[in-house]
From Swiss-Prot:
BP GO annotations: L-histidine biosynthetic process
Domain of life of the source: Bacteria
Record's keyword annotation contains ATP-binding: yes
One Gene Ontology cellular component annotation held by this UniProt entry: cytoplasm
Disulphide connectivity of cysteines: none
Gene Ontology MF term list: ATP binding; phosphoribosyl-ATP diphosphatase activity
Protein name: Phosphoribosyl-ATP pyrophosphatase
Compartment(s) of residence: Cytoplasm
Pathway: Amino-acid biosynthesis; L-histidine biosynthesis; L-histidine from 5-phospho-alpha-D-ribose 1-diphosphate: step 2/9
Keyword Nucleotide-binding: yes
Family: Belongs to the PRA-PH family.
One Pfam family of this chain: PRA-PH
UniProt catalytic activity: 1-(5-phospho-beta-D-ribosyl)-ATP + H2O = 1-(5-phospho-beta-D-ribosyl)-5'-AMP + diphosphate + H(+)
Amino acid sequence: MMVKAVKKKTVTKINKKTSAPAAVKIKSRRLSPLADIDPDNAVQVLNRLWEVVMQRRDADPAVSHSARLLSRGIGKVAQKFGEEAVECLIEAVSGDKEALIGESADVLYHLLVLWVAVGVEPAEVWRELTKREGISGIAEKASRAKILPRAAGLKTTKIP
């Protein structure tokens, strides 16, 4: 039976220079066995996290990490998502499963922040995934419209 550890946040003292909360310390706590996790509940967890990010987008950026990210604009949100995705890939290649799990959670969180930044709701993504369910990746990709790039100033996609 496999058990995974997650990060538990505990807030430390207030920083006297900025009057903002000091850095958040992270410590691990044990979760129930993976067999106890209901897949339907996993979607609900993501939906609830999206709601939290939505609520915090208008919060004080000095207090909320989500608000701080969103206040910096879509470019910074996308950059942070990319950084987290790269960290996830590094852990996958390194073979450190626990670190990969933690980085995967970071990727999901930052993906949700990205969705909030551009106005995508989780249900829209779940609907797209449902449409693709049961279709092979090759067949699904072949069914997409083919859009050929055009060089600047050309009215055709044909190569001269």
